[in-house]
């Protein structure tokens, strides 16, 4: 209904909510969004900064989302501050048509981060060595090796906790899988989370210090993954969960 008036130029979205835990989209939601935006002539822009872990082509590529614009932040350069954007050939043609109708001129972009040599080197290295099928294969396998035993661990103890995975990124929460940010926030248990993180730190293991998010690195070993699962199980035994 919000798009029906035809006065909304674009919808900018992240395919997975990740700043309040990981909230996966419901089946069919993103496909419906694409269909509705096309019907009303609204452009669709996807931000993959937090979902590039899905694979070399990001979440959009893995799920055939077909956005009009694709943007990504520091993840594409291995964590170094960076941003890129791209668009379809149809959008390019529309841009060129607009430019052709205008007087000739010049434009440019000159900012503190523009043309940074370190950023460009990091981006090149990441594109050549990180965002490839060969590199992602062990990352995805490691994520599955982590996610499946964790879910089994919770089920064996009768805990209604969930495990979410977005490619090489895994997260678990202390409740059934949330459908929105409000449900994710309501399910947070800060004291339990802090106790778990401290338990792991004291045993030489560290996870992201907000939420229970883990990202499998290309060089992550199976032994390290298994040790993490084992210590989470030991923690649950210690606190009688």
Regions found by a protein language model. Give the residues of each.
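Conserved N-terminal phosphate-binding loop of PLP-dependent enzymes in the Aspartate aminotransferase
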Residues: 1-241
């Amino acid at each position: 209904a919000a798009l029906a008036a035809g006065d909304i130029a674009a919808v900018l979205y992240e395919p997975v909510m990740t700043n309040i835990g990981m909230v996966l989209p419901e089946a069919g939601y993103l496909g419906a969004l694409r269909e509705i935006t096309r019907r009303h002539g609204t452009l669709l822009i996807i931000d993959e900064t937090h979902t590039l872990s899905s694979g070399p082509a990001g979440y959009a590529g893995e799920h055939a989302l077909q956005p009009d614009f694709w943007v990504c932040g520091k993840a594409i350069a291995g964590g170094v501050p960076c941003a890129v954007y791209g668009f379809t050939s149809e959008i390019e043609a529309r841009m060129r048509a607009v430019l052709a109708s205008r007087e000739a001129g010049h434009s440019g972009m000159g900012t503190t981060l523009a043309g940074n040599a370190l950023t460009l080197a990091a981006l090149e290295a990441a594109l050549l060595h990180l965002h490839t099928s060969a590199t992602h294969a062990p990352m995805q396998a490691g994520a599955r090796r982590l996610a499946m035993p964790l879910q089994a661990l919770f089920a064996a103890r009768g805990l209604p906790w969930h495990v979410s995975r977005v490619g090489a990124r895994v997260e678990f929460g202390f409740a059934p899988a949330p459908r929105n940010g409000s449900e994710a926030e309501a399910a947070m248990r800060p004291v339990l989370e802090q106790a778990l993180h401290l338990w792991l730190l004291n045993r030489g293991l560290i996870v992201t210090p907000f939420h229970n998010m883990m990202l499998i690195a290309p060089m992550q070993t199976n032994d390290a993954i298994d040790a993490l699962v084992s210590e989470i199980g030991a923690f649950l035994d210690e606190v009688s969960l």
